[in-house]
A protein has these predicted regions:
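C-terminal motif of bacterial Sec signal peptides marking the signal peptidase cleavage site
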Residues: 13-16
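Short, low-complexity N-terminal intrinsically disordered segments enriched in polar/charged residues
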Residues: 18-72, 76
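A short acidic/glycine-rich loop-to-helix N-cap element
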Residues: 46, 145-150, 176-183
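Sec-dependent signal peptide recognition
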Residues: 2-10
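A solvent-exposed, acidic/Ser-Thr-rich amphipathic alpha-helical stretch
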Residues: 71-124, 130-132
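Short histidine/acidic/glycine/proline-rich micro-motifs that form metal-
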Residues: 49, 88-91, 142
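Low-complexity, intrinsically disordered terminal/linker segments enriched in charged
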Residues: 37, 167-184
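Exposed beta-sheet edge and beta->alpha loop/turn motif
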Residues: 133-172
Length: 184
């Protein structure tokens, strides 16, 4: 009886120590749905899947180039058909136009961004092609013309194509302040 119980205990021990690596590795290679989106030109929700993590390094290099005012690196990372959509509704199209706007802005301002988080994601567009996106949370700081500090929370939704930044949507929120009033 003692041997029987010992044998059962050993079998249970071996089962509990079984390597689950094979199960986990097949999950990594499969498509993992992490959400859904109504992509431009579509009429129904499209699954959002895990995107290319390597785009995070491109974004970090891009932000560093902005902080360093390095227009050459920014232009190198931008796709020629780059598009930018700001929180105030402004739209800018083209790598050259983007660099000109930044050059003028950098002459009179010293904007800085700090990346706080990034989520690589992808989804099929209206043509069935997988688009690579990176959604990021960033802190933006600068000083206005009166010397007042500017602080905003920015969310950038960035589309990548062939290792280049093709499109950026910028959303912003002011620094949190406790208030007796609350507005939407």
């Amino acid at each position: 009886m003692k041997k029987y119980i010992t044998s059962i205990m050993l079998v249970l021990l071996f089962i509990s120590c079984t390597n689950n690596q094979q199960k986990n590795s097949t999950k990594k290679n499969s498509v993992i749905e992490i959400g859904s989106a109504l992509m431009d030109g579509t009429n129904e929700m499209t699954p959002i899947i895990v995107g290319e993590i390597s785009n995070q390094e491109i974004w970090l290099k891009y932000i560093k180039a902005h902080n360093d005012k390095n227009l050459d690196i920014i232009a190198e990372i931008n796709a020629e058909d780059w598009e930018g959509y700001t929180a105030d509704g402004s739209v800018l199209k083209g790598n050259k136009a983007h660099i000109e706007v930044l050059d003028n802005w950098f002459k009179s301002a010293n904007p800085k961004w700090k990346v706080k988080w990034m989520i690589a994601n992808a989804a099929k567009n209206k043509d069935g092609i997988i688009e690579q996106w990176l959604t990021t949370g960033n802190e933006y700081t600068d000083v206005d013309e009166n010397g007042n500090e500017i602080f905003e929370h920015n969310v950038h939704d960035i589309q990548f194509a062939d290792g280049k930044i093709k499109k950026i949507y910028v959303y912003k929120r002011a620094k949190a302040q406790e208030s007796a009033e609350f507005s939407y």
